[in-house]
Design a protein with these regions (language model features):
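N-terminal glycine-rich phosphate/pyrophosphate-binding loop and immediately adjacent elements
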Residues: 1-121, 262-263, 267
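Glycine-rich loop(s) and the adjacent beta-strand/alpha-helix scaffold that form part
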Residues: 24-30, 35-38, 210-213, 220-267
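Residue-level detector of alpha-helix initiation sites
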Residues: 11-16, 142, 243-244
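Short, well-ordered alpha-helices that flank and scaffold nucleotide-derived cofactor binding pockets
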Residues: 19, 23, 195, 251
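Conserved redox-cofactor binding core of oxidoreductases
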Residues: 106-217, 223
Length: 267
């Protein structure tokens, strides 16, 4: 199988990438996702993460290393599995980063990543700009209002918008919900794009290695239905497998600390 762009991981970012890149009909896009689509109603109900976190179909069920200050306990590290990734099982808070973080990225040599440059893309993703990601206001209540007032009394300023570039202070968050239902990125971004002839989604495909020619990534090997497959990329391979599995996949492909790879017998 061959495409112009191969995206590994259909999670919070991967679904957005697949939807946006396939807007160009000249690009052939393949999205490789280890999880399977699910009709589990708890994935749509906001309180449902109590049922889905820890479920082997929806959560990779990672654990931390033993914690020496907690009697060597291993703590759960939930990571979503399936189209939508961790946005399937997270707390649904919609919170953009702080202006200073983006401005620092630009100052380090990444033009176009400053806050004023990226903010239009945040705005574009929401319905006010014909975007697909619904964000809802939390209903106000007396107890939360009292908490905000108490924070102000303690010197913590109230804020009406955590997404305006300064997310310090006390106030009401926004939620990625619509009409009381969770809006994960699989539903918001990927589902409307799946009918495009230039987008193919490989569900149940576990990526095992990035293929290289010299220093250039040219494809991905994966296992689907117990069979090994290779998806070749004419232009780019994009790793979007999350904070744990993107570096893991690089290490399985021979990219990482030489000492670690040597101990594991990885070339």
């Amino acid at each position: 199988m061959q495409a112009d762009i191969v995206i590994v991981g259909g999670g919070s970012a991967g679904c957005v990438l697949a939807a946006r890149l396939s807007e160009d009909p000249a690009l052939q896009v393949v999205l490789v996702e280890a999880g399977q689509p699910s009709r589990n109603p708890w994935l749509r109900i906001p309180i449902g993460y109590f049922k889905t976190v820890g479920h082997p179909r929806h959560d990779w069920r990672f654990e931390t290393d033993p914690e020496p200050d907690m009697a060597q306990r291993r703590l759960p590290w939930p990571r979503g599995r399936g189209p939508g990734g961790s946005s399937l099982i997270n707390g649904m808070l919609y919170l953009r980063g702080h202006r200073a973080d983006y401005d620092q990225w630009a100052a380090l040599g990444n033009p176009g990543w400053d806050w004023d440059s990226v903010r239009p893309y945040f705005d574009r993703s929401q319905p006010a700009a014909d975007g697909p990601l619904w964000v809802s206001e939390l209903p106000r209540d007396a107890l939360s209002d009292a908490f905000i007032a108490a924070a102000a009394h303690a010197g913590i300023a109230p804020t009406a918008d955590f997404n305006g570039g300064d997310n310090s202070g006390a106030g009401y968050f926004r939620m990625t919900t619509r009409h009381g239902r969770r809006m994960d990125t699989g539903r918001a971004f990927l589902a409307p794009a799946r009918g495009r002839p230039n987008l193919r989604v490989l569900s149940g495909a576990q990526a095992t290695r990035v293929c290289f020619e010299g220093r250039r990534a040219v494809g991905v090997e994966c296992v689907r239905d117990g069979k090994a497959e290779r998806v070749s990329a004419r232009h780019e391979v994009i790793l979007s497998a999350g904070a744990i599995q993107s570096p893991q996949l690089l290490q399985l492909s021979g990219v990482g600390p030489a000492g670690l790879l040597g101990r594991l017998g990885l070339p």
